[in-house]
Protein backbone atom coordinates (compact mmCIF):
# COMPACT_ATOMS: atom_id res chain seq x y z
CA UNK A 1 0.00 0.00 0.00
CA UNK A 2 1.44 3.38 -1.01
CA UNK A 3 1.96 6.19 1.46
CA UNK A 4 -0.89 8.27 -0.01
CA UNK A 5 -3.38 5.38 0.23
CA UNK A 6 -2.25 4.56 3.77
CA UNK A 7 -2.71 8.17 4.80
CA UNK A 8 -6.19 8.26 3.23
CA UNK A 9 -7.16 5.08 5.11
CA UNK A 10 -6.02 6.59 8.41
CA UNK A 11 -8.08 9.72 7.77
CA UNK A 12 -11.16 7.62 6.96
CA UNK A 13 -10.75 5.51 10.08
CA UNK A 14 -10.36 8.61 12.22
CA UNK A 15 -13.50 10.09 10.71
CA UNK A 16 -15.42 6.91 11.53
CA UNK A 17 -14.08 6.85 15.08
CA UNK A 18 -15.31 10.39 15.65
CA UNK A 19 -18.44 10.28 13.50
CA UNK A 20 -20.14 13.53 14.43
CA UNK A 21 -22.31 14.21 11.42
CA UNK A 22 -25.85 15.21 12.43
CA UNK A 23 -27.13 14.17 9.02
CA UNK A 24 -28.32 10.79 10.28
CA UNK A 25 -30.83 12.60 12.50
CA UNK A 26 -33.08 13.01 9.47
CA UNK A 27 -33.24 9.20 9.18
CA UNK A 28 -34.34 8.71 12.80
CA UNK A 29 -38.06 9.15 13.51
CA UNK A 30 -39.70 11.76 15.63
CA UNK A 31 -41.73 10.43 18.55
CA UNK A 32 -45.08 10.78 16.79
CA UNK A 33 -43.80 8.85 13.79
CA UNK A 34 -43.57 5.70 15.91
CA UNK A 35 -46.87 6.26 17.70
CA UNK A 36 -45.65 8.22 20.74
CA UNK A 37 -48.24 11.00 20.80
CA UNK A 38 -48.77 12.37 24.32
CA UNK A 39 -52.02 14.02 25.26
CA UNK A 40 -55.33 14.90 23.69
CA UNK A 41 -54.71 17.98 21.57
CA UNK A 42 -53.69 18.13 17.92
CA UNK A 43 -50.30 19.45 16.92
CA UNK A 44 -49.68 22.34 14.57
CA UNK A 45 -48.74 21.58 10.94
CA UNK A 46 -45.02 21.35 11.76
CA UNK A 47 -45.36 20.07 15.33
CA UNK A 48 -42.76 22.70 16.23
CA UNK A 49 -42.38 25.97 18.08
CA UNK A 50 -42.52 27.66 14.68
CA UNK A 51 -46.21 26.75 14.45
CA UNK A 52 -46.71 29.81 16.65
CA UNK A 53 -47.08 32.67 14.15
CA UNK A 54 -43.98 34.82 13.85
CA UNK A 55 -41.51 32.60 15.72
CA UNK A 56 -38.16 32.00 14.02
CA UNK A 57 -35.37 29.56 14.96
CA UNK A 58 -31.74 29.64 13.86
CA UNK A 59 -29.03 27.11 14.72
CA UNK A 60 -25.29 26.78 14.30
CA UNK A 61 -23.54 23.50 15.07
CA UNK A 62 -19.92 23.85 16.17
CA UNK A 63 -17.79 20.72 15.67
CA UNK A 64 -14.02 21.08 15.68
CA UNK A 65 -11.38 18.34 15.66
CA UNK A 66 -11.89 15.74 18.42
CA UNK A 67 -12.75 17.98 21.36
CA UNK A 68 -15.42 20.56 20.42
CA UNK A 69 -19.06 19.47 20.19
CA UNK A 70 -21.36 22.41 20.92
CA UNK A 71 -23.39 25.11 19.22
CA UNK A 72 -25.93 27.92 19.35
CA UNK A 73 -29.71 27.92 19.03
CA UNK A 74 -31.52 31.25 18.60
CA UNK A 75 -35.26 31.74 19.15
CA UNK A 76 -36.81 34.98 17.88
CA UNK A 77 -40.42 35.83 18.89
CA UNK A 78 -40.82 37.92 15.73
CA UNK A 79 -38.76 39.11 12.78
CA UNK A 80 -38.60 42.75 13.84
CA UNK A 81 -36.37 44.58 16.31
CA UNK A 82 -37.26 43.10 19.70
CA UNK A 83 -35.76 46.03 21.56
CA UNK A 84 -38.16 48.39 19.82
CA UNK A 85 -41.11 45.94 19.77
CA UNK A 86 -40.91 44.03 23.05
CA UNK A 87 -43.03 40.99 23.88
CA UNK A 88 -44.48 39.98 27.26
CA UNK A 89 -42.48 37.22 28.90
CA UNK A 90 -41.86 35.33 32.12
CA UNK A 91 -39.28 32.91 33.49
CA UNK A 92 -39.86 30.03 35.90
CA UNK A 93 -37.05 28.17 37.66
CA UNK A 94 -37.54 24.50 38.50
CA UNK A 95 -34.07 24.01 39.98
CA UNK A 96 -31.68 26.92 39.80
CA UNK A 97 -28.26 25.33 39.30
CA UNK A 98 -27.61 27.17 36.05
CA UNK A 99 -26.83 30.40 34.31
CA UNK A 100 -29.80 32.11 32.67
CA UNK A 101 -28.50 35.54 31.80
CA UNK A 102 -31.04 38.36 31.90
CA UNK A 103 -33.64 36.49 33.94
CA UNK A 104 -34.08 39.02 36.77
CA UNK A 105 -35.00 41.90 34.45
CA UNK A 106 -37.40 39.70 32.47
CA UNK A 107 -39.27 38.79 35.63
CA UNK A 108 -39.12 42.33 37.00
CA UNK A 109 -40.45 44.06 33.88
CA UNK A 110 -42.32 41.15 32.30
CA UNK A 111 -40.89 41.52 28.82
CA UNK A 112 -38.24 40.31 26.39
CA UNK A 113 -36.14 42.85 24.52
CA UNK A 114 -33.73 40.46 22.77
CA UNK A 115 -33.92 37.08 21.07
CA UNK A 116 -33.27 34.04 23.27
CA UNK A 117 -29.94 32.28 22.78
CA UNK A 118 -29.09 28.77 24.01
CA UNK A 119 -25.51 27.49 24.12
CA UNK A 120 -23.00 25.74 26.41
CA UNK A 121 -22.27 26.85 29.97
CA UNK A 122 -18.99 28.70 29.50
CA UNK A 123 -20.14 30.33 26.24
CA UNK A 124 -23.03 32.27 27.79
CA UNK A 125 -21.15 35.54 28.10
CA UNK A 126 -19.52 35.33 24.68
CA UNK A 127 -22.95 34.70 23.17
CA UNK A 128 -24.45 37.65 25.05
CA UNK A 129 -21.62 39.96 24.00
CA UNK A 130 -22.02 38.98 20.35
CA UNK A 131 -25.81 39.39 20.44
CA UNK A 132 -25.56 42.81 22.07
CA UNK A 133 -23.07 43.93 19.42
CA UNK A 134 -25.43 42.64 16.72
CA UNK A 135 -28.43 44.43 18.22
CA UNK A 136 -26.59 47.72 18.67
CA UNK A 137 -25.96 47.68 14.94
CA UNK A 138 -29.68 47.50 14.09
CA UNK A 139 -31.52 50.58 12.77
CA UNK A 140 -32.92 52.83 15.49
CA UNK A 141 -30.44 51.66 18.13
CA UNK A 142 -27.94 54.52 17.97
CA UNK A 143 -28.88 55.97 21.39
CA UNK A 144 -29.34 52.69 23.28
CA UNK A 145 -27.22 52.32 26.42
CA UNK A 146 -28.67 49.20 28.04
CA UNK A 147 -29.72 45.85 26.57
CA UNK A 148 -30.92 42.87 28.60
CA UNK A 149 -29.55 39.89 26.66
CA UNK A 150 -31.27 36.59 27.50
CA UNK A 151 -28.95 33.59 27.16
CA UNK A 152 -29.51 30.11 28.59
CA UNK A 153 -27.20 27.11 28.76
CA UNK A 154 -26.58 23.51 29.60
CA UNK A 155 -23.20 21.99 30.41
CA UNK A 156 -21.98 19.77 27.57
CA UNK A 157 -18.39 19.74 28.83
CA UNK A 158 -18.17 16.23 30.31
CA UNK A 159 -17.64 13.72 27.47
CA UNK A 160 -18.29 15.49 24.20
CA UNK A 161 -17.40 19.17 24.42
CA UNK A 162 -14.26 18.58 26.44
CA UNK A 163 -12.69 21.81 25.16
CA UNK A 164 -15.44 23.82 26.86
CA UNK A 165 -12.82 25.81 28.80
CA UNK A 166 -11.76 27.41 25.52
CA UNK A 167 -15.34 28.76 25.21
CA UNK A 168 -15.47 27.50 21.64
CA UNK A 169 -17.99 29.72 19.91
CA UNK A 170 -17.35 32.91 17.96
CA UNK A 171 -19.22 36.16 17.49
CA UNK A 172 -19.61 35.29 13.81
CA UNK A 173 -21.33 32.01 14.72
CA UNK A 174 -23.73 33.82 17.06
CA UNK A 175 -24.57 36.32 14.32
CA UNK A 176 -25.11 33.43 11.92
CA UNK A 177 -27.61 31.79 14.28
CA UNK A 178 -29.48 35.08 14.61
CA UNK A 179 -29.48 36.09 10.95
CA UNK A 180 -30.30 32.60 9.65
CA UNK A 181 -33.33 32.22 11.93
CA UNK A 182 -36.39 31.24 9.93
CA UNK A 183 -39.92 29.96 10.15
CA UNK A 184 -40.73 26.43 9.02
CA UNK A 185 -39.32 23.08 10.18
CA UNK A 186 -36.82 23.04 13.06
CA UNK A 187 -33.89 20.64 12.95
CA UNK A 188 -33.75 18.43 16.04
CA UNK A 189 -31.30 16.16 17.84
CA UNK A 190 -27.54 16.68 17.87
CA UNK A 191 -27.61 20.18 16.40
CA UNK A 192 -27.15 23.74 17.59
CA UNK A 193 -27.07 24.04 21.37
CA UNK A 194 -27.90 20.33 21.59
CA UNK A 195 -24.80 19.13 19.74
CA UNK A 196 -22.92 17.92 22.82
CA UNK A 197 -25.71 17.24 25.31
CA UNK A 198 -26.94 14.05 26.95
CA UNK A 199 -30.24 13.18 28.60
CA UNK A 200 -31.15 10.16 30.74
CA UNK A 201 -27.62 8.92 29.93
CA UNK A 202 -28.37 8.80 26.19
CA UNK A 203 -27.63 11.41 23.58
CA UNK A 204 -29.86 14.43 24.11
CA UNK A 205 -30.25 17.52 22.01
CA UNK A 206 -32.79 19.95 20.60
CA UNK A 207 -36.44 18.94 20.45
CA UNK A 208 -39.65 20.75 19.66
CA UNK A 209 -43.41 20.21 19.56
CA UNK A 210 -46.65 22.19 19.44
CA UNK A 211 -50.32 21.98 20.34
CA UNK A 212 -53.45 23.73 19.08
CA UNK A 213 -56.18 24.29 21.62
CA UNK A 214 -59.72 23.69 20.31
CA UNK A 215 -61.40 26.49 18.37
CA UNK A 216 -64.25 26.40 20.87
CA UNK A 217 -61.91 27.89 23.49
CA UNK A 218 -59.25 29.42 21.25
CA UNK A 219 -58.04 29.10 18.69
CA UNK A 220 -54.47 29.48 19.94
CA UNK A 221 -51.21 27.59 19.53
CA UNK A 222 -48.53 26.70 22.08
CA UNK A 223 -45.05 25.70 20.91
CA UNK A 224 -42.11 24.40 22.92
CA UNK A 225 -38.41 24.03 22.14
CA UNK A 226 -36.07 22.21 24.55
CA UNK A 227 -32.33 21.75 25.00
CA UNK A 228 -32.03 18.47 26.94
CA UNK A 229 -29.01 17.66 29.09
CA UNK A 230 -30.37 16.16 32.30
CA UNK A 231 -30.66 12.93 34.27
CA UNK A 232 -33.39 10.78 35.74
CA UNK A 233 -35.10 7.51 34.83
CA UNK A 234 -36.70 7.79 31.41
CA UNK A 235 -40.43 7.16 31.07
CA UNK A 236 -42.20 7.28 27.71
CA UNK A 237 -45.99 7.52 27.86
CA UNK A 238 -45.75 5.95 31.31
CA UNK A 239 -43.64 2.98 30.19
CA UNK A 240 -40.46 2.56 32.32
CA UNK A 241 -38.04 2.62 29.40
CA UNK A 242 -35.08 3.65 31.53
CA UNK A 243 -35.60 0.79 33.96
CA UNK A 244 -36.10 -1.73 31.18
CA UNK A 245 -32.86 -0.66 29.51
CA UNK A 246 -30.99 -0.48 32.84
CA UNK A 247 -30.42 3.26 32.44
CA UNK A 248 -31.10 4.29 36.01
CA UNK A 249 -29.04 7.44 36.14
CA UNK A 250 -30.44 8.45 39.50
CA UNK A 251 -28.81 5.32 40.97
CA UNK A 252 -25.61 5.38 38.94
CA UNK A 253 -23.58 7.30 41.48
CA UNK A 254 -22.19 9.49 38.72
CA UNK A 255 -22.95 13.13 39.42
CA UNK A 256 -22.01 14.08 35.87
CA UNK A 257 -24.68 11.75 34.49
CA UNK A 258 -27.37 12.29 37.13
CA UNK A 259 -27.22 16.06 37.09
CA UNK A 260 -27.41 18.39 34.14
CA UNK A 261 -29.88 20.92 32.86
CA UNK A 262 -32.77 21.59 30.53
CA UNK A 263 -33.80 24.82 28.88
CA UNK A 264 -37.47 25.01 27.88
CA UNK A 265 -38.71 27.83 25.65
CA UNK A 266 -42.49 28.24 25.42
CA UNK A 267 -44.18 30.40 22.78
CA UNK A 268 -47.87 31.16 22.30
CA UNK A 269 -49.97 33.48 20.19
CA UNK A 270 -52.50 33.80 23.02
CA UNK A 271 -52.49 37.41 24.28
CA UNK A 272 -51.21 36.69 27.78
CA UNK A 273 -49.79 39.05 30.37
CA UNK A 274 -46.44 38.27 31.95
CA UNK A 275 -48.35 37.05 35.02
CA UNK A 276 -50.28 34.47 33.04
CA UNK A 277 -47.17 33.57 31.04
CA UNK A 278 -45.51 32.68 34.33
CA UNK A 279 -48.46 30.43 35.14
CA UNK A 280 -48.13 28.84 31.69
CA UNK A 281 -44.37 28.36 32.13
CA UNK A 282 -44.82 26.59 35.45
CA UNK A 283 -46.88 23.89 33.71
CA UNK A 284 -43.99 23.06 31.38
CA UNK A 285 -42.26 21.60 34.43
CA UNK A 286 -45.10 19.09 34.66
CA UNK A 287 -44.32 17.93 31.14
CA UNK A 288 -40.68 17.56 32.16
CA UNK A 289 -41.66 15.45 35.17
CA UNK A 290 -43.71 13.12 32.97
CA UNK A 291 -40.52 12.03 31.19
CA UNK A 292 -38.76 10.92 34.39
CA UNK A 293 -36.76 13.96 35.45
CA UNK A 294 -36.49 14.71 39.15
CA UNK A 295 -34.85 18.16 38.78
CA UNK A 296 -31.79 16.89 40.61
CA UNK A 297 -29.63 18.92 42.97
CA UNK A 298 -27.14 19.85 40.25
CA UNK A 299 -29.68 20.52 37.51
CA UNK A 300 -30.60 23.87 36.00
CA UNK A 301 -34.22 23.58 34.88
CA UNK A 302 -35.56 26.79 33.35
CA UNK A 303 -38.66 27.80 31.40
CA UNK A 304 -38.87 30.99 29.33
CA UNK A 305 -42.37 31.79 28.07
CA UNK A 306 -43.46 34.61 25.76
CA UNK A 307 -46.47 35.73 23.74
CA UNK A 308 -46.22 36.71 20.09
CA UNK A 309 -49.64 38.38 19.93
CA UNK A 310 -49.10 41.75 18.20
CA UNK A 311 -51.57 43.61 20.39
CA UNK A 312 -49.62 42.89 23.59
CA UNK A 313 -46.23 44.12 22.39
CA UNK A 314 -44.74 47.26 23.90
CA UNK A 315 -42.87 49.85 21.94
CA UNK A 316 -39.76 51.25 23.59
CA UNK A 317 -41.37 54.62 24.33
CA UNK A 318 -44.65 53.26 25.69
CA UNK A 319 -44.99 53.67 29.47
CA UNK A 320 -45.90 50.04 30.11
CA UNK A 321 -46.91 46.83 28.41
CA UNK A 322 -50.66 46.76 27.80
CA UNK A 323 -52.19 43.32 27.73
CA UNK A 324 -55.53 41.91 26.70
CA UNK A 325 -56.09 39.51 29.57
CA UNK A 326 -57.80 36.23 28.83
CA UNK A 327 -60.72 36.21 31.21
CA UNK A 328 -61.92 32.76 30.19
CA UNK A 329 -60.55 30.24 32.68
CA UNK A 330 -61.32 27.42 30.24
CA UNK A 331 -58.93 29.03 27.75
CA UNK A 332 -56.16 29.20 30.33
CA UNK A 333 -56.68 25.60 31.43
CA UNK A 334 -56.53 24.47 27.80
CA UNK A 335 -53.24 26.33 27.34
CA UNK A 336 -51.88 24.62 30.45
CA UNK A 337 -52.82 21.21 29.06
CA UNK A 338 -51.24 22.13 25.73
CA UNK A 339 -47.89 23.19 27.18
CA UNK A 340 -47.60 20.03 29.29
CA UNK A 341 -48.20 17.85 26.24
CA UNK A 342 -45.86 19.83 23.98
CA UNK A 343 -43.03 19.85 26.52
CA UNK A 344 -43.25 16.10 27.03
CA UNK A 345 -43.20 15.40 23.29
CA UNK A 346 -40.40 17.90 22.62
CA UNK A 347 -38.20 16.02 25.10
CA UNK A 348 -38.96 12.70 23.40
CA UNK A 349 -38.13 14.26 20.02
CA UNK A 350 -34.78 15.49 21.35
CA UNK A 351 -33.90 11.90 22.25
CA UNK A 352 -35.31 10.17 19.18
CA UNK A 353 -33.71 12.54 16.67
CA UNK A 354 -30.33 12.66 18.43
CA UNK A 355 -27.52 10.64 16.91
CA UNK A 356 -24.60 8.90 18.61
CA UNK A 357 -21.79 11.40 19.13
CA UNK A 358 -18.11 10.82 19.89
CA UNK A 359 -15.15 12.95 20.85
CA UNK A 360 -11.79 12.44 22.48
CA UNK A 361 -13.66 12.41 25.79
CA UNK A 362 -15.85 9.44 24.92
CA UNK A 363 -19.02 8.39 23.15
CA UNK A 364 -22.65 9.06 24.05
CA UNK A 365 -25.00 6.59 22.39
CA UNK A 366 -28.34 7.51 20.89
CA UNK A 367 -31.30 5.64 22.33
CA UNK A 368 -32.29 2.55 20.34
CA UNK A 369 -35.58 3.20 18.55
CA UNK A 370 -36.13 -0.53 18.03
CA UNK A 371 -35.76 -1.24 21.74
CA UNK A 372 -38.12 1.61 22.60
CA UNK A 373 -40.71 0.18 20.21
CA UNK A 374 -40.42 -3.25 21.82
CA UNK A 375 -40.79 -1.89 25.36
CA UNK A 376 -43.76 0.28 24.45
CA UNK A 377 -45.52 -2.67 22.84
CA UNK A 378 -44.93 -4.75 25.94
CA UNK A 379 -46.60 -2.08 28.07
CA UNK A 380 -49.63 -1.81 25.82
CA UNK A 381 -48.58 1.27 23.89
CA UNK A 382 -48.92 0.48 20.21
CA UNK A 383 -45.92 1.87 18.36
CA UNK A 384 -45.78 2.16 14.59
Regions found by a protein language model. Name each.
Residues 24-384:
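Alpha/propeptide regions of enzymes that mature by internal proteolysis
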Residues 1-8, 17:
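Bacterial N-terminal signal peptides that target proteins for export
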Residues 15-17, 22-27:
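Boundary at the C-terminal end of the N-terminal hydrophobic targeting segment
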Amino acid sequence: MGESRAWLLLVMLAAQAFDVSPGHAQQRPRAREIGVAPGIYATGPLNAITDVPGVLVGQVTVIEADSVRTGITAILPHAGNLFLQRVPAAIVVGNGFGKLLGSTQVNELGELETPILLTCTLCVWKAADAMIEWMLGQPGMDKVRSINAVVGETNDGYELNIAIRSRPITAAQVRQALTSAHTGPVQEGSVGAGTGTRAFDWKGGIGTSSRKIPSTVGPYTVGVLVQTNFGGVLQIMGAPVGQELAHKVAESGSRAHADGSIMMVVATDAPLSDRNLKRLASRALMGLARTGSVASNGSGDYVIAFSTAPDVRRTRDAPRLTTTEMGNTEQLSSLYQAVIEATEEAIYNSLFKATTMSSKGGTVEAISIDKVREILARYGIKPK
